[in-house]
From Swiss-Prot:
Its main location: cytoplasm. Keywords: Cytoplasm, DNA damage, DNA repair, DNA replication, DNA-directed DNA polymerase, Nucleotidyltransferase, Plasmid, Transferase. The keyword Magnesium does not apply. It comes from the Bacteria. One of its GO terms (molecular function) is nucleic acid binding. SUPFAM superfamilies: PHP domain-like (SSF89550). One of its GO terms (biological process) is DNA replication. It is found in: Cytoplasm. GO terms for cellular component: cytoplasm. This is Error-prone DNA polymerase 2. PANTHER family: DNA POLYMERASE III SUBUNIT ALPHA, ERROR-PRONE DNA POLYMERASE. DNA polymerase involved in damage-induced mutagenesis and translesion synthesis (TLS). It is not the major replicative DNA polymerase. Residues 1040-1066 are annotated as: Disordered. It comes from Agrobacterium fabrum (strain C58 / ATCC 33970) (Agrobacterium tumefaciens (strain C58)).
């Protein structure tokens, strides 16, 4: 018997379905089901995933949606043609616009207005008067396209209920059709289905009651079983295929039209693009286009004409032109930097005359995929660009892509644990022991937490959390991926309001958009561009120099000397500990060295075993040999090692005779070979082509294995070059203007890898004077103050460093102060009219000390004497006299002041940093008594020496390709130390590694040149030692930068992972690995 299941809910219904489209379609194929109708509730968010599953399994997808109306009526709708699909997407858009984020409000009148061309299937409850009224309405609205669902509920009166619904349907001439209301692909998912129901209703399994599914039959059944269950309703069974035949629409029919751009009068898009290219060329090449660049430009323009991509280039050009007209720093990156056309138009900054670009990496005729140009803007001004796009293209034709927020380990543990009723402390203990997003918790670790792994609920929590990981939780908004259309965008996909004001998103993410070959424009935010813009402003204001990205001195010797010393904290791309480890070995001296540096600390070159050969050849320890001059021409700059994606493509083209398009297909197949195995079809062509061109079979095989190893992670050279430009500029500013760099970096927070405490500490080491927050001198941003008798400047910390202080309150303080400093707390309160809460925040940040000489407790005592607001009589007098008039005189009180240690903790608590002593300095006597030496002494010890040191934990890194090895950075008053923890020790001391604010390490020094590590043998938690600093029973909280993935969350699927940290800064960054397990190559100096 043939059967199609028309009522299938995937997990893209968000906490309703418990299986993915892939699982459902694969199961359907195994069971012999001919078609699947996906009907997620009020949403088409998962329909493209269903299309991809349909393509993979060759099971027909029927596009549909379940509409839950405000009057309680539920309806399955299926568009029969392309026009009906557009009406469905507009209908959902209408409901989302009323309901807002994660809600959809639709009425029956809306359905009537948009129902033409749709099949409607009523989902009835009981065969009562309400059901009869609903049948009458659906018959009138849908005519012969009206059906009613027959679905078992596993109740005693099931057969009677079906019989009565069938009779009612006959009375209103509505046809019946069998559905199974599928929520999961196989019976084993029933438990997870109950759990997601509990999560959705914010309740526990003990209290969920009848909200959970009342039976376990909501899984896919084979046609034979459906025939047995509905033996009395053979016609209704047959109608499942009838509906499939009537629904001729397929998502493959969606044809995307790019918007027509504002073009040169009388010219089409291609002619306009060429006009702008030749018009802009003199700006880039005042002395005329070099012949090789001219040839490249003509080749690119021909390919753009063939692919009809001119409107896309014009769009990006217009966006960049708008940003520059507003003084917003921006720069294109990614594969687009391979384009000479993009360079001439000012979209990217990589000069094709000095860099060997490969346009096929960007646009390829064989690949037939839309181009993807990523443009970075200052992160604090990107919203101006976004709103300009909405204004220019209108909200009918422009929206951001969605991102799918998925469950990760911690979020899954928390939600499943709550649903199963575990105590909060148990949930917290479990989740705090999780490192990676998919990590399992061994029984031994559970016992270390004083929990019983044999407890049924605990075991079930871990089992179901594993099943929940990766499941969608809700939709968020893409950082800046815009989809723009010629016609209405909601003809293609439903649109919903974003959480942020004046933004809207489509229901599909970037992968869905790519699957349907839509073009998107990426308007991305880059914090370092904000930092650079603010740095240029400060240099202009205080140094009298006009600097920007285009006129910074190139190849500056002092800048490269600083980079070679790995003195790059806070700079762009080469600031991480892994990058710092490579810098003393690679020793960059030119811009191209910096390009290599950016790209080499990635999993790709490491997995392809390219890092060590490159370094050995660079150091002269290994000869550089090229079998042919052609290969030397391709790999000469990288010493015979294919470090970049473009290198791999050029090797295939030059050595094996691949076309540009074939080489790009090779790159893409390598990127997915672990999942598709598609690379094998290229291996024979590559190896045989190289042998044919005179290379030995052994060399050809070695070349292929190298490319295969790094293909999935290889970095485009053009992308590395774009990033290297900003990396160089940031290092130049840090080298020559360290005071400016510190202030600009603090004013651009949150961004980057490091917390303000590390940024300020590094600036002080570079001789920058940093002054505390002051109620009479600080502004919102950090500023520069000239040092008396010198041409140097000090950095004055701004009010932005004070935690909890509102921008509006800070603005009122600055405006009231003008050129007349506040004389007292009372004076400040009256003249600024800020609430006392703002004064308390400033007092806790010690902002009254620098100018008013009030210690924390004195300032707080003075604030206690203030009213909620000044009395009108005194306020009027103060305004008339232009000075504060006290309401009453407070007697002087001698308060006991805080200890130095207590002040340090208060500094960290309220400003995130301290200008006093390092916290560990207060513990040095006790540590020395335990034979614990300073970090600097440990890092200067000879190779092989056993040392015992301790410090605050700043960074934890566990690179994905490091096979479980963890790298930890600690710090004391003498500087940082770099710790290596082997997997066995990590598992034994997991709670210490993941939970310590301060850690002691006993281990052996490993040294190779300037690269030094302490390989841990024993780990001890010294967090309790920090408690005594403030003479109180609260833990010390070390502020963490945004790179802190363990404490802040990893930008991962479950946004609720981002809880306030009670542990120090840790992170998980898979792309920061250098030498797999050869730890001598890492340097955290």
């Amino acid at each position: 018997m043939s059967y199609a299941e028309l009522q299938v809910t995937t997990h893209f219904s968000f906490l309703r379905g418990a299986s993915s489209a892939q699982e459902l379609f694969e199961t359907a194929k195994a069971l012999g089901i001919q078609a699947i109708g996906v009907v997620d509730r009020n949403s088409l968010a998962g329909i493209v995933r269903a299309l991809e599953a349909s393509r993979a399994t060759d099971i027909r997808l029927v596009v549909g949606c379940r509409l839950d109306l405000t009057d309680g009526m539920s309806l399955l709708v299926y568009p029969t043609d392309r026009a009906a699909y557009s009406r469905l997407t507009r209908l959902i858009t209408l409901g989302k616009s009323r309901g807002g984020k994660n809600n959809c409000i639709l009425h029956w009148d809306d359905v009537i207005a948009y129902s033409r061309g749709m099949i409607g299937v009523l989902v009835p409850d009981l065969p009562d008067a309400t059901c009869a009224a609903q049948l009458r309405r659906i018959a009138e609205a849908f005519g012969d396209r009206a059906y009613v669902s027959l679905c078992l509920r596993r109740r005693q009166n099931d057969q009677m209920r079906l019989h009565e619904i069938s009779n009612l349907a006959a009375r209103f001439k509505v046809k019946t059709v069998v559905t199974n209301d599928v929520l999961f692909h196989e019976p084993g998912r029933r438990q997870l289905q109950d759990i997601v129901t509990c999560i959705r209703h914010n309740t526990t399994i003990d209290d969920v009651g009848f909200e959970r599914e009342r039976h376990a039959d909501r899984y896919l059944k084979p046609p034979e079983e459906m025939e047995r269950l509905f033996s009395r309703y053979s016609e209704a069974l047959a109608r499942t295929l009838e509906i499939v035949r009537r629904c001729k629409f397929s998502l493959e029919e969606l044809t995307y039209q790019y918007p027509e751009e504002a073009i040169v009068p009388g010219k089409d898009a291609q002619a306009s693009l060429e006009h702008y290219v030749w018009e802009c060329a003199p700006d880039r090449y005042p002395e005329g286009l070099p012949q090789d660049v001219l040839k490249t430009v003509r080749h690119e323009l021909d390919l753009i004409r063939t692919m009809k991509y001119a409107p896309y280039f014009l769009t990006v050009f217009s966006i960049v032109r708008f940003a520059r007209s507003q003084g917003i720093l921006c720069q294109g990156r990614g594969s687009a930097a391979n384009s000479a056309v993009c360079y001439i138009l000012g979209i990217t900054s990589i000069d094709p005359s000095t860099n060997d670009l490969l346009f096929e990496r960007f646009v390829s005729q064989e690949r037939d995929e839309p181009p993807d140009i990523d443009v970075d803007f200052e992160h604090e001004r990107r919203e101006e660009v976004i709103q300009w796009i909405y204004k220019t293209y209108t909200k009918d034709k422009a929206a951001l892509c969605a991102t799918v927020t998925r469950y990760r380990a911690k979020g899954a543990i928390r939600d499943v644990g709550k649903a199963l009723g575990l105590p909060e402390d148990v949930i917290k203990a479990l989740s705090s022991g999780m490192w990676s997003w998919s990590e399992e918790v061994p029984d031994r670790n559970i016992r270390e937490l004083n929990l019983n792994p044999d407890d049924r609920r605990l075991a079930l929590t871990l089992k179901l959390a594993q099943q929940l990981m990766g499941a969608p939780r809700h939709l968020g908004q893409h950082p800046g991926g815009f989809v723009l259309t010629h016609d209405r965008l909601d003809d293609l996909v439903p649109i919903e309001p974003a959480t942020m004001k004046d933004r809207q998103i489509i229901e599909w993410d970037k992968d869905d958009v790519e699957a349907l070959k839509f073009m998107k424009v990426d308007v991305l935010a880059l914090g370092m561009l904000t930092c650079m813009a603010k740095a240029f402003d400060l240099i202009r204001e205080h140094k009298g120099q006009q600097l920007d990205l285009s006129n910074i001195e190139q190849e500056d010797a002092a800048t490269y000397a600083m980079i070679r010393k790995a003195d790059t904290l806070g700079t762009f791309q080469i600031e991480s500990r892994a990058q710092m480890a490579m810098l003393p070995r690679l020793k960059p001296r030119t811009f191209y060295d910096l390009v290599v540096q950016v790209a080499i600390v990635r999993p790709g070159p490491i997995q392809g075993d390219m890092v060590h050969p490159y370094l050995r050849r660079r150091e002269g320890k290994e000869p550089v040999e090229y079998p042919t001059p052609e290969l030397e021409a391709v790999l000469g700059k990288t010493l015979g090692v294919p470090l970049f994606q473009e290198s791999a493509m050029r090797v295939a083209m030059v050595c094996a005779g691949f076309t540009g398009g074939e080489a790009d297909q090779l790159r893409k197949s390598m990127a997915t070979f672990k999942f598709t195995g598609g690379v094998s079809r290229f291996k024979d062509k590559l190896v045989s082509g190289m042998v044919k061109n005179g290379y030995s079979p052994e060399f050809a095989e070695k070349t292929f294995s190298q490319l295969e190893g790094f293909g999935s992670y290889g970095f485009p050279e053009s992308h590395a070059a774009s990033f290297a430009l900003i990396a160089y500029a940031s290092n130049y500013i840090k080298c020559h203007y360290p005071d400016v760099f510190c202030a600009a970096l603090l004013n651009s927070q949150p961004m980057g890898f490091y917390a303000p405490a590390q940024i300020v500490g590094d600036a002080i080491k570079h001789g920058v004077e940093v002054r505390p927050v002051c109620v009479n001198r600080s502004r919102w941003d950090c500023t520069l103050e000239r040092i008396e008798g010198s041409d140097r400047h000090a950095v004055r910390l701004g009010f932005r460093q004070v935690k909890g202080l509102a921008v509006a309150d800070a603005a009122r303080i600055v405006a009231a102060r003008m050129n007349n400093p506040f004389a007292s707390v009372d004076d400040m309160w009256r003249r600024s009219s800020v609430p006392t809460e703002a004064l308390v925040q400033l007092a806790e940040a010690d902002a009254f000390l620098p100018s008013l000489k009030l210690e924390r407790r004195d300032a707080l005592w003075a604030i206690k004497a203030l009213r909620d607001e000044p009395l009108p009589l005194f306020a009027a007098a103060a305004e008339r006299e232009a000075t504060a008039i006290a309401e009453q005189q407070e007697p002087e009180v001698a308060l006991r002041q805080m200890t130095d240690g207590h002040n340090v903790i208060e500094d960290y608590s309220h400003t995130g940093l301290t200008l006093r002593q390092h916290p560990v300095a207060f513990l040095r006597r006790d540590l020395s008594a335990r034979n614990i030496i300073p970090c600097a002494e440990a890092m200067n010890a000879r190779d092989g020496r056993w040392v015992y040191t301790a410090g605050l934990v700043l960074v934890r890194q566990k690179p994905g390709s490091a096979k479980g090895v963890m790298f930890i950075t600690i710090e004391d008053e003498t500087g940082p130390a770099n710790i290596v923890v082997w997997p066995s020790l990590f598992e034994k001391r997991r709670s210490v590694v993941l939970g310590s604010s301060m850690m002691a390490i006993n281990g052996r020094i490993q040294r190779e040149g300037e690269v030094v590590h302490l390989v841990a043998q024993q780990l001890f938690d010294l967090s309790a030692d920090l408690v005594g600093l403030a003479d109180r029973d609260t833990g010390f909280r070390l502020p963490a930068g945004r790179g802190d993935e363990f404490a802040h969350g990893g930008g991962g699927p479950d946004s609720r992972d981002r809880q306030k940290p009670v542990v120090p800064r840790d992170m998980f960054t898979p792309d920061l690995h250098i030498d797999t397990l050869k730890i001598k190559s890492r340097n955290f100096q």
